[in-house]
Each structure stands twice: as C-alpha cells, then as structure tokens.
Amino acid sequence: MYKEPFQPTYEYALECDKHDELKDFQTEFYKKEGTIYLDGNSLGLLSKRAEKSLLTLLDSWKEYGIDGWTEGEHPWFFLSEKLGELTAPLIGALPEETIVTGSTTTNIHQVIATFYEPKGIRTKILADELTFPSDIYALQSQIRLKGLDPDEHLVRVKSRDGRTLSEDDIIQAMTDDIALILLPSVLYRSGQILDMKRLTAEAHERGIHIGFDLCHSIGSIPHHFKEWDVDFAIWCNYKYLNAGPGGVAGLYVNKKHFNRLPGLSGWFSSRKDKQFDMEHTLTAADHAGAYQIGTPHVLSTAPLIGSLEIFKEAGIERLREKSLHITRFMLNLIAHELSDFGFTIGNPLEDEKRGGHIYLEHAEAARICKALKANGVIPDFRAPNGVRLAPVALYNTYEEVWQSVMILKKIMKDEEYKQFENKREVVA
C-alpha cells in the first residue's frame, strides 16, 4: 500500500500520497487553504457528511417539531442506540454494548458510580499519574461520595520516565485493596498504547473490574473488546471521530454486566416501551442504553452520523495501517532534519506501542507551537514542554508531513520562535 523503504525526501512523500488507498477521503473534509492541520488528536476536522447530517437533523426539527422524536430519517428517540451500533465495530464490541451519550467526564462518573463498590479491604481505585486531569477529578469526586478520602483511596501508578507507564508496574499495583481500575488506552501526552488485553486479564485474575478511557485511541487504533473482555470504557467523539466541538461522547459496558443497575439513573435509562409510562420505579433498558441519564443532545450528536459513515467505508484496519506508516515517516523526517535543535521524541517508537500522534519535547515548546501556527501549521502544546503533531489518516497527506517538518526546521534554524512568549495560550 505504501512505498518502502522510508526515504526522507519530498519525492518519497509524493509517491506515498500517490499510492494512498485512503486519499479519496481527503476531499470529504474542510481543510483551510494555506494551513496544515495536525491537531486532529485534539479536535478533528469537519467533514461534508458530518455537516450534512447536522443540517438534516436541524431540518427534522423544522419539519416535524415534536414528532421528530419518532419521524424522519433519523428519529431522535432511537439515535443514541443507532449510533452506538455504528460505533461498536470500532471497539470490537457488540451493538447492544455501546451507546452514544453524555460527555467523557459524565460517563466516567456513570461507570465509576456503577462499578465502584468499596467493601472490606477492597476500597481503592487504581489509576495513573499521567492520565488526563478530568479522569482524576471524577475519581476523587466518586471516592468522596462514598465517604472516603481520595488521598488514601486513589492509587496512582508512577511513571519511570515522566512519559510512559510500565505495564509491569501497573500489574504490581493490582493489590488486594484495589476495588476498581480506570486507565487510559493511549496516554494523551506521549501517545503510548497500553496493552489492554494483558491488563484486563491480570485484573480479572485478581477479581478486579477494569475499564479504559479511549479518548486518544478510538478512531485511531483497532480494539477487540469481545476478545479482551474489558468491563467498561468511555470516550469522546470529537477527536479522531470528527464529531465536532462538544460532540456527544460514548460509553461501553460488557454485556455480562447488564444485570447491574446504573449508578446514575434518569428517564432515558428506561426501557423504551416503558419510558413514557411515567412510573416512579425504573425499568432499566437491558443494554448499554440503560447508562444514559437525560434527554439526548440531538444536535450535538448529529455530526457523528455522517462521520461514522466515513469510518465504515474506510475501515479501522486500513486507517491504522496508514497512521502507523505516516507517523513513522514523520519520525524519520524529524530524526533526519531536526537532530541539531534540541528536540526529544517523547512517544514510543515501536509500532505496537505508538498511537496516532507524535510527541516532541523541547524547552521552548510553547513558543515553538506559536511559531508553527504563525507559519500555517496547527499543532498543540501540552505542558510542561510538549508539542503534539497528529497526521490523521483520513485527511492528512505525506506532503503535508514533509512540509510541516521543513517549516519546523526553518523556525528552529532562524530562531523565529524567540519572538513569542514561552507560555501557553488560554486554550492550548
């Protein structure tokens, strides 16, 4: 599919673009002329199909009013379940195990409220010190709601190098006092992929439920939840899945747990045929839909309809193949062109351990990101010293990768970054 061996040349980049089996999808996305967008790991670009599905649902409100809940091409009442079914193949789950609902953080609250049952000596939640802050805030909150002290009952696995986690260290921390585990599938800074299959097996061997935050993996790498037997997972849909800013998130619950009453319930937790009976006793849905709480955010869900159509056509395996190849090309270019400018590659180099973005460390990272933006390259900065660059398989080209590295080289060689302040913007 892609030309081998790797060559750090412009001609090689053009040759790879020529043989890219996914190149036709690039025209599906709105790409600003004169800009190289490498921030799809933070917010994916708008596709024409996502725009169309948003306008379609807006029109259904215009045409049907209240009857839009049951009429039209995409009846709102069943939309969360329908999109869950379309998402399920991306994580290797059954359709009934997946639901589009809430936000990442509210869904963390939901699964922790459901699965965290401190009893006897098992009172602690295991996480890690490199995970996204919102995960930690939610875990601390849920521990407090049980009347416990997060300082004592939230265990965070330490990183050996400040970038990655050792799976051996995580397993060693699965002690007899651990009641529940929540880990990232891919670390948001370094892009390290954790071995979810191994960690799940080790947790279950010790009688511990385990779940994963998929925000930086879904839509970028394949998952095999049916095989791995993961207990639960949560994710956002606005990064690699291109559902738009504030797009409604996703939640997975293994079918073996369908007999559990959701920790947080609302009327959309109901079985559909019972919901409008308005009874004060909840008859929970017998699928992941039970983990919904309130009325779905229809217009914030709508873009995902068109986006998931694209993923179905492209295929997650093909997307991963290109992602690995184009990130390897970028890594090789960085090693070849930027070795004299003080950069450290902070993500794993092994394909099986590397997610969809490149993570560069530099003492001047914040001002380098500003200089890149001034030159038409959109990265993002992560404190304290990280530059993230995500060549997304659906819409980025090898030519763009080559151009972005050359622009970065010029910025460093000419010290253009020095005209900017070395601190982050309000939104990094």
Swiss-Prot record:
Pathway: Amino-acid degradation; L-kynurenine degradation; L-alanine and anthranilate from L-kynurenine: step 1/1; Cofactor biosynthesis; NAD(+) biosynthesis; quinolinate from L-kynurenine: step 2/3. Keywords: Hydrolase, Pyridine nucleotide biosynthesis, Pyridoxal phosphate. One of its GO terms (cellular component) is cytoplasm. It is an enzyme of class 3 (hydrolase). One of its GO terms (biological process) is NAD biosynthetic process. The modification N6-(pyridoxal phosphate)lysine is found at residue 239. Disulfide bonds: none annotated. One of its GO terms (molecular function) is kynureninase activity. Signal peptide: none annotated. HAMAP family: Kynureninase. PANTHER family: KYNURENINASE (PTHR14084:SF0). Belongs to the kynureninase family. Catalyzes the cleavage of L-kynurenine (L-Kyn) and L-3-hydroxykynurenine (L-3OHKyn) into anthranilic acid (AA) and 3-hydroxyanthranilic acid (3-OHAA), respectively. This is Kynureninase. It comes from Bacillus anthracis. The lineage of its organism: Bacteria, Bacillati, Bacillota, Bacilli, Bacillales. The gene is kynU.
